Structure formats: C-alpha cells, structure tokens
C-alpha cells in the first residue's frame, strides 16, 4: 500500500528506535495507561505523527475515555487513513498516518461516548508528538 512518504524498514528502524518501530511499523500497542499522553488534556495545540510530523489531531478533539490510551473523537481532514483490521479474530478499523502509513491505533464507533462523531480514536502515545501551536512545517 503506497503512501506519499515511503522509506525502507531499515531507515524507519534507525529513525524511530525500537519501541516506536514496534508500534508504528509492526502494529504493536502500548500497555494500558503507560503512554505519556493518556492523561494529558491540553486545551490547544496539535498532535502530530511521531514518524513524519504530519498534523493528525487538534488537542480540542482529545477526551477522557478511561480506556488506557489517548482518545480523540476526530482527526484533521485527510490525515488519518482507515484500514479494515481482522487480526486476532476481531473486526476493527486500524488508524494509520495518511502520509507515512505509520500505525497509530484503532477507531471504534458507537460506544456511547457523548462526542460529536460517536467515535473513539484509540491512539498509542508513542505514535504521537504534541506541539503547543499549530504549525505548517510538516
């Protein structure tokens, strides 16, 4: 599956380091509650892809889901690609960066959260970086 930014797996390994590589390129996950952004709720700013720095989520879309991972109810338009994921005998929707294809987490719908989209983007902290202000240097 092609993405605008493509690199070899060796390049990703060098750039990301072992833990981010495991999560972002091998579709791993963090332990619940272990991520640095799980309990942080900035009022403004943006979350970007840890691999390619593409803008992904506005801080204003982050909410407390009590699931153990950062949760967002919507991504910036066109920035997160949804891919059907039937691994481990489950039907889920994988969230990946639309620019580099890095694994972010999964998207769930209809869980009863009172947010504008009725979605929970359950995202690994290791897949994100936070910027206090919106930037155009992605």
UniProtKB/Swiss-Prot annotation:
**Source organism's superkingdom?**
Eukaryota
The catalytic site is made up of 122 (nucleophile)
Task: Give the required cofactors.
Answer: Zn(2+)
Write one Pfam family the protein is assigned to: SelR
Please tell me one Gene Ontology term that the record gives under cellular component. Answer: cytosol
Q: Does the keyword Calcium apply?
A: no
InterPro entries from the entry?
A: Met_Sox_Rdtase_MsrB, Met_Sox_Rdtase_MsrB_dom, Mss4-like_sf
- List keywords of the entry alphabetically: Cytoplasm, Metal-binding, Nucleus, Oxidoreductase, Zinc
Name where it mostly resides.
Answer: cytoplasm
- What compartments host this protein? Cytoplasm; Nucleus
The protein's name is: Uncharacterized protein C216.04c
- Recall the taxonomic lineage recorded for the source organism: Eukaryota, Fungi, Dikarya, Ascomycota, Taphrinomycotina
């Amino acid at each position: 599956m092609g993405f605008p930014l493509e690199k070899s797996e060796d390049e990703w390994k060098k750039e990301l380091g072992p833990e981010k590589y495991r999560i972002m390129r091998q579709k791993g996950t963090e332990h619940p509650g272990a991520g640095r952004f799980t309990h942080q709720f900035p009022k403004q700013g943006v979350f970007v892809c840890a691999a390619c720095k593409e803008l992904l989520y506005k801080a204003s879309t982050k909410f407390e889901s009590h699931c153990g991972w950062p949760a967002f109810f919507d991504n910036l338009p066109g920035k997160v690609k949804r891919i059907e994921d039937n691994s481990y005998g489950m039907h889920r929707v994988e969230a990946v960066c639309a620019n580099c294809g890095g694994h972010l987490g999964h998207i769930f719908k209809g869980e009863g959260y009172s947010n504008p989209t009725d979605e929970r983007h359950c995202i690994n902290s290791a897949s994100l970086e936070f910027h206090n202000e919106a930037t155009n240097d992605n």
